[in-house]
C-alpha cells in the first residue's frame, strides 16, 4: 500500500511495472493496483507457470524476466504508454529493465535486493529521462509516520482482506510445536506462499 500511495500520484489507467511479481509483496501490489484502476506489468522468472494465477489476482501483463528483447516487446503492448512507477525487489540487471520501461520523470522504488547485485544507473536515465530513485523500508516508515497514517493503512488493508479483495497465498500451516520445520520450509527457494505458525496448537 505504501508503495502505491507514497511516491507517485497514481490515477486510473496508469501503468506500473514490478519485478518479483510472484512474491508476497508482488501479489499484494497486483491486487491493490487493481482496486485503484491501475494497470500492472509483472516480471517473473516462470511466466508460463504463473500467468493464469497472477492474472486471476488482477495482473494485466505477466512477462518473462529474461525473455529476449523484453523491454521493447512489452512496451509495444502498452499502446504508447509507459509505466510511471517501478517496484524493485531484485536489483542488478532486473532493475535496469524496470528503469528502461519507465516514462520520463517516473520513479523506481527499491524495497529489496534479491539478486544481491548493486543497481548501476546509466547517466542517461537520470539526465534525459529524469528518473527518480527512492527506497522503501517499511520498518523505518512505521517508526516515523504519523500514527493516524499507520492506522489508516492498517484499516484499509484489513477491510480489503475481510472483503476478500486482498488475499495472500499460504503454502503450509504448522503448529507451534513444529517451529523448526516451519523455519526450514520458509528458507526453501521455491514455495507457493507464506509459511504460517498456528499459535493455539501445540
PLM regions and their residue ranges:
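Mid-domain Rossmann-like dinucleotide-binding core that forms the NAD(H)/NADP(H) cofactor-binding site
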Residues: 1-67
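Local beta-strand N-terminus motif with an aromatic residue
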Residues: 13, 59, 82-83, 126, ...
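N-terminal Rossmann-like NAD(P) cofactor-binding module of classical short-chain dehydrogenase/reductase
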Residues: 17, 86-87, 109
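Glycine-rich phosphate-binding loop and adjacent beta-alpha segment
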Residues: 93-165, 198-202
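C-terminal capping/lid region of NAD(P)-dependent oxidoreductase domains
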Residues: 80, 158, 163-172, 180-202
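Short amphipathic alpha-helix with an adjacent loop that forms part of the alpha/beta core around
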Residues: 69-81
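Short, well-ordered coil/turn residues at beta-beta hairpins
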Residues: 19, 88-89, 199
